[in-house]
């Protein structure tokens, strides 16, 4: 973490590097002791430029961690039945421990049906309805990567989270809802806010933990934040400013940082944690598939 006048900047990039290092060490130990190599299959349908970048980065980091990387790139016009057949083959492949279908999918495909075709034990994104239900009932589940990364940063920053008031701004199935569930499982008092929430600013000011995942650039300002609160900014928004393109979060960092006790920047905060947690989930899936002890990455940063 880096100190700043008024608060601490949570260095997600450094923490993610620590997670990846722990994963790589565990993978090497797994191969040496048991001859097992975790395998991650990533499926990309279409030519979306952002998705291509994400898939390329995932492949690089998977291989750097010592895992097997299987990339399947399909044209945008691929029939859904063909994609389902590929998923069925990956489900049955013992060398593949994690399956990720890059979203968004082309419009003619039913994303929910595709995700739920993945074997829940290989669903390293944590989006399968079974994993959602397991998480919601406090049982062992594959946890979505971005909320898991946020939770790791919060634990590292605050230690015990029990009894803290947490406000999650955003109710998506990918971030908002699972984030709220993870915080509830940590014994926080959790409120989910969204675009219809009355007096959103006032609600945010009650939060000891404020998670912004609404997809609106710089929506949350410094005067919305309780002094000393920990702010986790999940937003990644590209804006044009002074003739240049730049990335900003859902939080107005310049006004929020002097008020917050700790805050994640954009970029360099939550973003790097997502792929690190994907690798951790893949390793976990491999250990479960082989009846081996699961590593604990709760305090893997630094």
From Swiss-Prot:
Which GO biological process entries does UniProt record here? L-histidine biosynthetic process; methionine biosynthetic process; purine nucleotide biosynthetic process; tetrahydrofolate interconversion
Q: Which Pfam families does the annotation name?
A: THF_DHG_CYH, THF_DHG_CYH_C
Q: Which pathway is it part of?
A: One-carbon metabolism; tetrahydrofolate interconversion
The record, for InterPro entries, names:
Aminoacid_DH-like_N_sf, NAD(P)-bd_dom_sf, THF_DH/CycHdrlase, THF_DH/CycHdrlase_cat_dom, THF_DH/CycHdrlase_CS, THF_DH/CycHdrlase_NAD-bd_dom
Query: Which SUPFAM superfamilies does this chain map to?
Result: Aminoacid dehydrogenase-like, N-terminal domain, NAD(P)-binding Rossmann-fold domains
What is the catalytic activity of this protein? (6R)-5,10-methylene-5,6,7,8-tetrahydrofolate + NADP(+) = (6R)-5,10-methenyltetrahydrofolate + NADPH; (6R)-5,10-methenyltetrahydrofolate + H2O = (6R)-10-formyltetrahydrofolate + H(+)
Q: Which GO molecular function annotation, any one, does this entry have?
A: methylenetetrahydrofolate dehydrogenase (NADP+) activity
| UniProt keyword NADP, yes or no | yes
E.C. numbers = 1.5.1.5, 3.5.4.9
Q: Which UniProt keywords apply?
A: Amino-acid biosynthesis, Histidine biosynthesis, Hydrolase, Methionine biosynthesis, Multifunctional enzyme, NADP, One-carbon metabolism, Oxidoreductase, Plasmid, Purine biosynthesis
Gene Ontology CC annotation, any one: cytosol
User: Where does the chain bind NADP(+)?
Assistant: 170-172, 195, 236
User: What family classification does the UniProt entry report for this protein?
Assistant: Belongs to the tetrahydrofolate dehydrogenase/cyclohydrolase family.
Can you state the subunit structure given in the record? Answer: Homodimer.
- Which PANTHER family does UniProt cross-reference here? C-1-TETRAHYDROFOLATE SYNTHASE, CYTOPLASMIC, C-1-TETRAHYDROFOLATE SYNTHASE, CYTOPLASMIC-RELATED
What the protein does comes down to: Catalyzes the oxidation of 5,10-methylenetetrahydrofolate to 5,10-methenyltetrahydrofolate and then the hydrolysis of 5,10-methenyltetrahydrofolate to 10-formyltetrahydrofolate.
Q: What's the name of the protein?
A: Bifunctional protein FolD 2
**Biological classification of the source:** Bacteria, Pseudomonadati, Pseudomonadota, Alphaproteobacteria, Rhodobacterales
Q: Which gene encodes it?
A: folD2
